[in-house]
A protein has these predicted regions:
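A sequence-level detector of short, solvent-exposed, charge-rich linear segments
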Residues: 16, 20, 57, 64, ...
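Positively charged n-region of N-terminal signal peptides that target proteins for export
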Residues: 1-4
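N-terminal Sec/ER secretory leader and immediately downstream segment
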Residues: 23-104
Length: 221
């Protein structure tokens, strides 16, 4: 019962009004990885056929190395968001209307209530509002492991494995079409060997492996 009340409180407190009134942001830095259900590096012929129909879903993950947000220390904590949109999440970059989104957020189960709220606020801010209309906030045991050549993330119903090595296939004039969905430094394109969400709260589930659909890098805010 207590856990259910905490989760409900976090969803309410994660509203834009509550996040805006939370005070100064502080300084925070760490590692970031994302993958969407569309290739970010592909040929024009493929993009032309997929732009309106794919890329509606994504997983975004932040691992804080050190720092605070809204005055709350987040050292060593992690937050993961699964996002479902009504259209390609990056379509605005190529002239389309911005997607309306719903988000399920997984906050580090080691965090206290104030830290969990700060993690949600940080994800909302660094994703430039993409992590919005939050329908679920779930405390979870989260794995975020940089294994050298790949990054592994697991949280609740989210599974993400990103290879840092990507071949630049010249087929069909391949090029980069999109940028990261969140604020990130030194962003590099990766291959999502696994990109899956199996939860029920977003009205969408996905599994979209083996695609050049990922970005990884660091963040500082």
């Amino acid at each position: 019962m207590k856990r259910g009340m905490l989760v409900a409180a976090l969803v309410v407190l994660a509203s834009p009004l509550a996040l805006l009134s939370a005070g100064g942001k502080g300084a925070v830095s760490g590692e970031y990885v994302e993958a969407r259900t569309a290739e970010v590096f592909t040929g024009g012929c493929i993009m032309g056929s997929e732009a309106e129909t794919v890329g509606k879903n994504a997983v975004l993950a932040w691992k804080v190395n050190q720092g605070s947000f809204n005055g709350v220390s987040l050292d060593g904590l992690t937050v993961v968001a699964a996002v479902a949109g009504d259209r390609n999440l990056g379509i605005g970059e190529i002239g389309g209307a911005k997607a309306a989104t719903r988000s399920a957020v997984f906050v580090d189960s080691r965090a206290n209530a104030a830290q969990q709220l700060a993690l949600v606020a940080m994800a909302t801010e660094l994703s430039k509002g993409l992590v919005g209309n939050i329908v679920e906030v779930t405390p979870s045991a989260i794995e975020f492991a940089d294994r050298g050549k790949e990054i592994h993330v697991a949280a609740g119903q989210v599974a993400l494995d990103v290879s840092k090595e990507m071949s630049h296939d010249p087929t069909c004039g391949a090029m980069q079409w999109f940028h990261p969905l969140a604020t990130v430094d030194q962003a590099a394109i990766g291959v999502a060997q696994q990109n899956a969400f199996s939860g029920s709260g977003l009205g969408a589930k996905w599994s979209d492996p083996n695609r050049r659909s990922a970005f990884f890098g660091t963040f500082a805010y």
